[in-house]
Amino acid sequence: VGTTVDTVVQEAECDVLVERIGSQGDPDSILLPTAGGPHAEYAAEVARAIARTTGASVTVQRIVTPETEDRERERARASLDETIDVLDDVASDTQIVESVDVASAIVEASADHDLTIIGATREGVLQQLVFGNIPEQVGREAAGTVIMAKRDLGITSRLRRLFTRS
């Protein structure tokens, strides 16, 4: 995203939204890719608020690899259902998309939506170095406007900030 923004996002002791402005005007369609977790739940809450205000519909998307076993696909479906519950009365649908490249699949799907809202990563520094940071790649490459949502996790967030400074 950028060094100043990265620092603010990492150091903030509150929930944070980072927006890369793309298209102008109210969105008609929101893409909400999710892999679960507190940042994804916050992203769903943001999508719900925007959709209620604008009348937009929300597509909740989960990416699985071709090798994903049936049990994990069932968990993915359950995760989508939990996200739909967060969206409450907002017009929404779900998609399970099969791809070997999660970020590229999200970027491709973003072309069909006005706005993409994604939760910040929960991955550790080593995983990000090896696999890349999916929300950042989506933020750089997705069509339209992108919002990255990061929930303050209280003591967990403060401990992570303390240990990553050292």
Q: Which residues fall in each region the model found?
A:
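Charged helix-capping and loop-helix junction motifs
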Residues: 2-4, 75-79, 131-135
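Short helix-loop-beta junction
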Residues: 50-54, 81-91
